[in-house]
Amino acid sequence: MRFKPAGRWLQTILLSLALVLCLLRFAFLRADFPNHSPWMIDQAKFTDEGWWASAAVRHFLVGHWRVAGDYNPASVVPVWPLLLALVFHFTGVSLVAARTVNVSFSVASVALVFAVVRRYGGTETTAAVAALLLAASPFAFAFSRLATLDTVVVFEWSLLLWVASYVKPGRRWPIVAMGILIPIMLLTKTTALVLVPAVLWVLWKKSPRAILAVCAMVAAAMGIYVCIVLQSRYATDYHYFYAINALAEVDLASTGSYLMQLFRHGMWVDRILYPAGLAVLLLSLAWLRQLWKNPLFAASWIALAGDAVFVLRRQDDYAPRYFLVMLVPLILGTVLTLQELKVRNRSLAALLAATLTLAIVLDTVQVLGFLSHRQYQFHDAAKSIQAIVDADPAAHRLLLGTSGDQLSLMTGIPAINDGYSNQDLRQKALAYQPGWYVGWNELDQDYMDDLSAFRLDEVANYAVFDREDRNRLKLYRMVPVKEASK
């Protein structure tokens, strides 16, 4: 297909802007998660990076992946810690290295979105718009700079859609690749299961017989992995992970309010793109039904619906990061509609194009605002804690606390968790004898009862982040009561 010079210039401009915005994600990776953002309630900014990386961090700090009685999620989601272990082999334990890997996945997702749109009938301009929307997203920007799992899952899902586009009778490599990639996605994050139906839909549209082969490979791979884990010393950790993540009973009486809450919180994804996407969905159901013949369009809404059902099932127990996997499906559905409207109704196409342009401009301004108003409160607090611990060799060099694993990733000081533990906290504290406790704001009385064998002396107090209940990080020296009484 030949393009007019104006079209080529537009594509070049869009892709150049996307590239610049992607590269900006690598800037200032030591900076804190943005304060006063729409996603300030998300606790991933002070816990999750450390939790998911903990196995790799421990491997290098203490020589083994697992700490008995502690929170060991790698038994269920091993892909990320295995990848970080490879990276840390060259860099050492490093928060910046972990975040760089995550940002790299986010940038690769932008490239994949471009490729996916092209593979499913989108023009180069449509694909470039999709890439720019993802590159400019402040939601993706903020969470891609945390070394958590959601960004990797978005990449894996996009990769699966791209691989699925090559499926056809007689071609084996896409089937084998999907049979491998789906288990990898599920072993990256268990909730990625909600995205699998969208992938299977595309596969069914390409080659119905291929579904059986892919499902058989996925079932075999997951079955073998689970059997191996349950026969190993990681079985307790495996069961504990699912126990603490079990869903609460459904409160049918509150379903209506939860549904309204879900629709309202969709604004976390994007304040313009989200309502535009909902309008596009209604338009496709009422008029542009031709769009549903495109497997990518249907798969996008299946994926979004799958994640929405999962979030709704959690009732009110969820965080903004749970919505991150909605972003790419929303973008794909919107840009494919824009392309269709250019043929069917130029006035509506112009309106949607103007809306997306406004979204890109406002999103870019917000991203630049995050970079220009960056803060290092958590980073500076972590370095101060590291200096205090290093200066007191008499205290056992082991942190205890909910954010202990996060600080371990940031400082290289070993840590254990006080919040998640398959061992009684009192017994664990006596067994491991941590020298330091890190907590947020006021001490929890239940924890204090469990730590009654120690006296907690406050050593430092730091202003960190913007949540009222989590805005003071405190360091305590843990002195055994017997030692203190001498």
Model-identified regions with their sequence ranges:
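Transmembrane-lumen/periplasm boundary regions of multi-pass, lipid-linked membrane glycan transferases
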Residues: 52-57, 196-197, 203-292
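Transmembrane signal-anchor helices characteristic of membrane glycosylation enzymes that use polyprenol
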Residues: 10-45, 218-233, 308-309, 360-363
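Short acidic/glycine- and proline-prone juxtamembrane loop motifs at membrane-interface regions
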Residues: 102, 139-152, 319
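Membrane-embedded, lumen/periplasm-facing catalytic core of multi-pass transferases
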Residues: 355-408, 414-415, 419
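Transmembrane-helix motifs of polytopic, lipid-linked glycan transferases
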Residues: 100-121, 159, 283
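Transmembrane alpha-helical segments
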Residues: 22-28, 314, 337-339, 349-376
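Membrane-proximal lumenal/periplasmic loop motifs of glycosylation machinery
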Residues: 37-50, 60-81, 89, 96
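Membrane-interface helix-loop-helix junctions at transmembrane boundaries of multi-pass membrane enzymes
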Residues: 4-9, 118-119, 171-172, 205-215, ...
